[in-house]
């Protein structure tokens, strides 16, 4: 769960901000605008960075550590989808219309 207490966030936030700025460096002049091509390159660098962080903090691999890490990565994916993708898709449904076959699943 990413909702850690404020003290833990305080310890991490400046490092995270610095890393994010470092990753963005050279990709965009304006943080509001990045091409899909540049974003693809940036995602590769994010993947590299996360892979190194995971490897360095895991120390020696074990089945249980690998299982826990893959579980956390899955949770990150699900939370991103729940918080970012789902609201975006709901906006698009309202603006462009729903898929007609899905109407039977709509909540009252």
Give the location of each predicted region.
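Solvent-exposed interaction surfaces and binding hotspots enriched for charged
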Residues: 1-108
């Amino acid at each position: 769960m990413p909702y850690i207490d404020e003290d833990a966030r305080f310890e991490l936030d400046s490092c995270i901000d610095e890393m994010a700025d470092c990753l963005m460096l050279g990709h965009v002049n304006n943080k509001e605008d990045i091409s899909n091509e540049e974003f693809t390159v940036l995602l590769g660098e994010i993947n590299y960075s996360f892979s190194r962080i995971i490897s360095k903090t895991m120390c020696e691999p074990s089945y249980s550590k690998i299982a826990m890490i893959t579980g956390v990565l899955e949770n990150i994916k699900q939370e991103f989808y729940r918080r970012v993708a789902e609201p975006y898709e709901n906006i698009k449904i309202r603006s462009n219309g729903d898929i007609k076959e899905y109407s039977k699943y709509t909540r009252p």
